[in-house]
Swiss-Prot record:
Disulfide bridge map: none
Designated name of the protein: Nucleoid-associated protein CT_335
Principal location listed in the UniProt entry: cytoplasm
Subunit description: Homodimer.
Family designation: Belongs to the YbaB/EbfC family.
Statement: the UniProt record of this protein carries the keyword Cytoplasm: yes
UniProt cross-references to Gene3D superfamilies, sorted A to Z: Nucleoid-associated protein YbaB-like domain (3.30.1310.10)
Single GO cellular component term: cytosol
Purpose of the protein: Binds to DNA and alters its conformation. May be involved in regulation of gene expression, nucleoid organization and DNA protection.
Length: 96
């Protein structure tokens, strides 16, 4: 096993450490999304765990309860897009 193998192994260890640091950093961050001009807001962490949900009473319509579900889905999608954007930006600095 020549020095090429040792170099590749060292690079792999470095990438693994960078990836673990990126994961740890993301876990500490919060990403928010909202829908309906702020009627529903959702916050997730870097692992995509739901951290907070806020629903303003104005969107609670007993005649159309599906509105809240639609707004929740849209707010979650926006928060997930923010997380995905952050992950993409972080991965740009990774050597793979």
């Amino acid at each position: 096993m020549g020095s090429g193998y040792a170099k590749k192994k060292k690079e792999a260890k470095l990438m693994e450490r960078q990836f673990m640091e990126m994961e740890a950093s993301l876990e500490q961050k919060r990403f928010s999304g909202e829908a309906g001009n702020g009627l529903v807001s959702v916050t997730i962490n870097g692992k995509c765990d739901l951290v907070d949900v806020r629903i303003k009473p104005d969107c609670l319509d007993p005649e159309d309860p599906e509105v809240v579900a639609d707004l929740f889905r849209a707010a979650f999608k926006a928060a997930k897009a923010a997380l995905d954007s952050e992950m993409s930006a972080m991965q740009m600095g990774m050597p793979f």
